[in-house]
Structures are given as C-alpha cells and as structure tokens.
Amino acid sequence: MSAPESSPSTFYTVPTKHILSKAHLAAFQRSKTHSDIFNFIEELNEDIVGKKLTEAGQGSERTRPLISILDSVREIAESTPPVDNKLSRFGNPAFKTFYDKVGDASLELHKRIPGLPEEAIQEVEVYFKESWGNKQRVDYGSGMELNFLSWLLCLAKLGVVTKEDYPFLVLGVFWRYIEVMRYLQSTYWLEPAGSHGVWGLDDYHFLPFLWGSGQLRNHKYLRPKAIHDPEILGEFSKDYMYLSCIEFINSIKTASLRWHSPMLDDISAVKTWEKVNQGMKKMFVAEVLGKLPVMQHALFGSLLPFPTPEEDPELKRALEEEDGQSATDMHGHIHDPSEKGWSMDCCGIPVPSAFAAAQDANSHKGVPTLGNRPGIKPIPFD
C-alpha cells in the first residue's frame, strides 16, 4: 500500500455508483482502483499465510476500535429482534430497522477510530453502511462483502491502519465481521443475492475462502480433501477460516457436500492449498470484479476513484458507440444478456435463506437449535 492519500487540502466525496454498462466495467478493470483493490487482497493474503485465527492477538491501538465498532453493530442487531413473520420464509422486515439504526450510529462509531480525519468520515462511512446488506431487498451478497473490503482499504489509504496491522485486519477485524454477518443472516433470514448459492462456495461469502486457503497454504499436513473429515473440521475450524466455513455450511445443510456445495467438493480434489489459493484469486477477479451484475453496485469516491472519459479515451469512445446493450430492471439493476457465470443471477427469483428454509413455521418443539436460536434445523438444500 502506498503512502497515505490524505492531506489538509484533500477533498473528500460521498461515494456513488459509476458502472452503468460494459464500457464502464471495462474502464474499471483498467483503472488504478481495480489494481488497488486486488493488490490489497493479495497483500492481506500473503500476510496471513500459516497464521491461525486463534493467534490473531488483541490488535493494536489502531485496530482495536474497529473490533469495538463491529461489536456495536452486533449490539444494535441484538436490540432489534426480528418481527413475527411466520408466514414468510424470506427476509425479515426488522432488518430495515437495523439498517437504519446502523446508519444513524455510523458517524459516532467512526469517531472512535484514531487518526481518521473527521472530514473523511462522510466518504468512508458509506462503504461501512453498505456492508450489512441491501435494505430494499433484505439480501446480502458479494457486493456488500466488497464494500467492507473497500472500507478497510480506505482506512489503509488514509494511514489509519498500517502494514503491520494487516494480519489482524483479516484474522481479527474481517473475521469478526463474518461472525456479525452470520448473526444477521440467521436472525433476519437475509436472502442470498443470487439464486445459485452465489458462487457455489457459500450462500453469501467469498473472501473467507480466498483468505482461508491462503492461511493453509504451507500447512504440513492438512490438504484440501480434509474438508470431508468431520474430526479435522471439529479440531481445526477454530483456527482456519476455510474449515470454519465448511463446518458452518455442514451445520445448516444435510446430505453430502457434493449435493449442496458441488464447487467446494470439486475444489477439495485439488492437490495443494497453493493451487486452491491461486484459483480463488483468479475467480474473485473474474466473478466479482469482472461481472457487471456485481460491480454495478460498486461505489467510488476520492479514495477509490472511477476514471473519467477524459482520463480514459477508451471509455469515452466506447460510451459513444454503446447503445442499449444493458437493460435496467424494476430494482434499478443492470443486466447484460451476454453475461455468463455464477454472478449473472444478481436478482433472479428471490431465494429464502438456509435459515428461513429450515424454520418450522408452526412450532419450535423438538427442533434442534443453531447458535442458541431455536427452530433452525439442517436442511437438504436451499
């Protein structure tokens, strides 16, 4: 990461959407912001190789407030219980109240961060507020996870966190975010943003698998096929994100991994974690940063700028030639008919979360619990 991008004369802007067509997406892929995002992912990935979640430590004076902020988000959720919505297996309306509460608290939460310029909060907090799910659709997908990554990247660009904080950013801060998201997903039954189980990895997340495979890259004994061994999952899931995610998936879905998560099953046949990690990075570039249905929701400001037509002649030329190649739906989402891949199904048919599908609408009696929340039971598929 380069030197902090902040000075007394810095003009911060509220991030907005810029990717409206394939031409805009191509411009983003050529941009410095695209490089900054991927390089940040790679730097964090390299800094956690061989490191365990249980060895994350307490963080520094710079990063401990980030944990405090995430804990406060969890507390907001705990104080905003789901409404009685037994007739629906889709997202719980109480999530919208939670979303608004986080927005109301955001300014004060960001004031806890030492070294964060107050004038930068208006820009940085937008990524934070958009990290928890979509208020309108009551769903969650890789775009929101990307917003959280962008929030961390902005803090790094501002010099709020430094290179020595990078291991804790993943093993401490990011993992706490995942824990909070699991609570939100199970409490409010957030729908997966895309009806393919998103990437075929997890209904909601991608980065825990990317960085999780990075953690295991030089492990002497554990191999990708170890995800099929319940004893290994039981012993090591507390240490490694990848294994924890597998154990979590198994806890809410029955049948074999091959049935409910075929891509994870296929990946388990790869010989080394090194190859898994390389594949995950390529997949992220192609299926997240490279797909219009995902990146149309990306936000750009002064810290993560979008190139202008004047800065990118190819963009200017393409915009002049492009004519109605992408269609906007009732939600304001753009769909390109030529788009292929897992991420094409940005909206699709609403899909209930695994938690909602597992909920017995009539009675909780005799039903196993998950995370101390009654009525959640394993299901064969979502």
Swiss-Prot record:
Biological processes per GO annotation: mitotic spindle organization; response to osmotic stress
A Pfam family the protein falls into: PTPA
GO MF terms, alphabetically ordered: peptidyl-prolyl cis-trans isomerase activity; protein tyrosine phosphatase activator activity
Enzyme Commission numbers on file: 5.2.1.8
Main location: cytoplasm
Gene Ontology, cellular component aspect: cytoplasm; nucleus; protein phosphatase type 2A complex
Region (Disordered): 363-382
Enzyme class: isomerase
InterPro entries (UniProt xref): Phstyr_phstse_ac (IPR004327), PTPA_C_lid (IPR043170), PTPA_sf (IPR037218)
Keyword tags: Cytoplasm, Isomerase, Rotamase
Subcellular location: Cytoplasm
Alphabetical list of SUPFAM superfamilies matching this protein: PTPA-like
Catalysed reactions, semicolon-separated: [protein]-peptidylproline (omega=180) = [protein]-peptidylproline (omega=0)
Function: PPIases accelerate the folding of proteins. It catalyzes the cis-trans isomerization of proline imidic peptide bonds in oligopeptides. Acts as a regulatory subunit for PP2A-like phosphatases modulating their activity or substrate specificity, probably by inducing a conformational change in the catalytic subunit, a direct target of the PPIase. Can reactivate inactive phosphatase PP2A-phosphatase methylesterase complexes (PP2Ai) in presence of ATP and Mg(2+) by dissociating the inactive form from the complex.
UniProt family annotation: Belongs to the PTPA-type PPIase family.
Name of this chain's protein: Serine/threonine-protein phosphatase 2A activator 2
